[in-house]
Amino acid sequence: RHMLELEELKLVEQFEFDGYLLLNGGYCTIGSQIIYDNKIPQEDLKEIVKIVKENNYPCLFIESNQMYITHVNQRVIDAQASISTMIPPISNQINIDNIYQVDPYVDEKGIKEIIKNTKHVKVTKWHDYAYDIVPKTGGKAAAIQAVSKHFGYQKEELMAFGDGHNDIEMLDVVGYPIVMENGSDEVKQHACYICDDVEKEGILKGLKHFNLID
């Protein structure tokens, strides 16, 4: 998630956290301090942008302080609705110096075409027609390890909640990997505990199950 999305969902107003692991782990902060920062290399972004423009793919580009999409179609509308997030503003002015994540709204053939000439990125799927492209050295697991190192935590002291394919690497680096009931069977294979769906207060119930809150 982007901080703009957390603000849109009013999560920042409701809860005060010590830090945030944002943009699939590409941008992590503790208070006002940036402790992890991992952008997509420019050489790969140039290749991605070239293919996106040639094929007129709808694609979301995410910077630390803003995000924008090339254009909108039904795939974009459906994918954004599935995560309760508004559609970002449309722009074709892409700043390749400051991109942390790229989200193409395409099928499997499309994503293969987009990354065919890249060397330093990896892909995870979060919707039937939506993917995350992030640095190969980054991701949620790398971010958790950076935060863990910052605080001196051990793996056994860490807990993470997830429900999507793009959460698997994160679940594998914590001592308490918890998967939501709505997660796929593949994701659930990485869990030590299955909690209820998000809509049924699954995270709250999971925290109570492990006696972290009353």
Regions found by a protein language model. Give the residues of each.
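Active-site phosphate-binding/coordination module
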Residues: R1-R75
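Well-formed, non-transmembrane alpha-helical positions, independent of function
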Residues: K10-L11, E169-V173
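Short, structured coil segments at secondary-structure junctions
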Residues: F15-E16, N24, N117-K119, V173-V174, ...
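Hydrophobic/aromatic beta-strand patches that form the interior of the parallel beta-sheet core
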Residues: L21, M159-F161, I178, C195
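Conserved acidic, metal-coordinating active-site core of Asp-based
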Residues: I51, N55-P58, I62-M170, N182
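Asp-based, Mg2+/Mn2+-dependent phosphohydrolase catalytic module
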Residues: V173, I178-D214
